[in-house]
Amino acid sequence: MHILVVSVNYRTAPVEFREKLTFQAAELERAMTTLQNQKSVLENVIVSTCNRTEIYAVVDQLHTGRYYIKKFLADWFQLEIEEVAPYLTIFEQDGAIDHLFRVTCGLDSMVVGETQILGQIKDSFLEAQQVKATGTIFNELFKQVITLAKRAHSETTIGESAMSVSYAAVELGKKIFGELTDCHVLILGAGKMGELALQNLYGSGARKVTVMNRTLSKAEVMAEKYMGHAKSLSELQCALLEADILISSTGASEYVITKEMMTKVEKMRSGRPLFMVDIAVPRDIDPAIDELEGSFLYDIDDLQGVVEANRAERLKEAEKIQFMIEEEIVLFKTWLSTLGVVPLISALRDKALAIQSETMVSLERKIPNLSDREKKVISKHTKSIINQLLKDPILVAKEIAAEEGASEKLALFAKIFDLETEEVESRAEEVEHKRVWTPSVPSL
């Protein structure tokens, strides 16, 4: 089995391509279920954010797995593999494990050290579990990754000086307008990104705020927190007439603001400029609007320069986290290496329990007057003896599994205990196809 990551991210693909490969939240479970049925894919988790779409997979063959994951992406988004391939980055084995740790800890983010990605990874993992797309390997790996990411942020200061994309959008507005107190601000979208932007705007002095959302009740709840006003998206054109600053993050599949709409609005704005930041992927605002004289449009890739602030300080903290990651990878690989011994241990336990069961049957024949309570006590104590006898051999087997030449040593181990090869192989199949174990994931 092999661990594989297929990634489209802000480093390798511009926003105009990333938006073509973005999974909507409502379709993520269906996508993971579909991918799980692809040839070679044993486990999978799909992560899709404004800066990356990544498929994490356990595959039985690297070459076959790579091909069918690429094919899945192309088919899902109705593109040709040749269109998708140039923008893909592929990580395998240790590189894939390291990449997952780095992404979850915020080391691979546009804003190094940001914490939002940790929640996004956790949500994707839990959704994958719900549709039974994860198994033994990813249940352990993602549990370990999420735990380390929390520890990394609590034991270092990397997140203290990191700004979110939403914060960067507000900072860009402040550079252009200076004080925001008298600016009319329009927020499109009442999701996490929109609320983060509004929170930062409010902290920067903005008080003339309007929140718009397809569901008016969500806009009302968000606006009330920050003394703003809520409006339905049906009133968008009127709201654009009043706004000085627009920050959009609706997550719609089509443009919310078109060039045609903005052309009409500009004619009625009497030459007043409108500063627009589109932090949605797919984009909410038609990029052709930037051609208009009075509209100044920035997308998420344009914020790169803004988020460079305090980068040197955060990179020092990132080095500490990378060291923590490397230690954790060693622990995971040690655990992974012991998976091969699980069938052997199971076969050993089964054989011992079979002997105990046969002994109990023989004992009950020889002493037929035993009460049910006496039978339970004898059974419990004989099982306890078995567990004590097996404890040391099992520990030794696990240690052997992590050593070089483990297969030959484990074969000798099986021979000593006279374990049938077929029985061990049968147990190995059970472990490989196990899909039911669900770990407790630490809350964020």
UniProtKB/Swiss-Prot annotation:
GO BP terms, alphabetized: protoporphyrinogen IX biosynthetic process
Remarks, miscellaneous: During catalysis, the active site Cys acts as a nucleophile attacking the alpha-carbonyl group of tRNA-bound glutamate with the formation of a thioester intermediate between enzyme and glutamate, and the concomitant release of tRNA(Glu). The thioester intermediate is finally reduced by direct hydride transfer from NADPH, to form the product GSA.
Keyword Membrane found: no
Protein name, per record: Glutamyl-tRNA reductase
Taxonomic source organism: Bacillus cereus (strain B4264)
Active-site residues (renumbered): C50 (nucleophile)
PANTHER family tied to this protein: GLUTAMYL-TRNA REDUCTASE 1, CHLOROPLASTIC (PTHR43120:SF1)
Keyword check for NADP: yes
Top-level taxon in the UniProt lineage: Bacteria
One of the record's GO molecular function terms: NADP binding
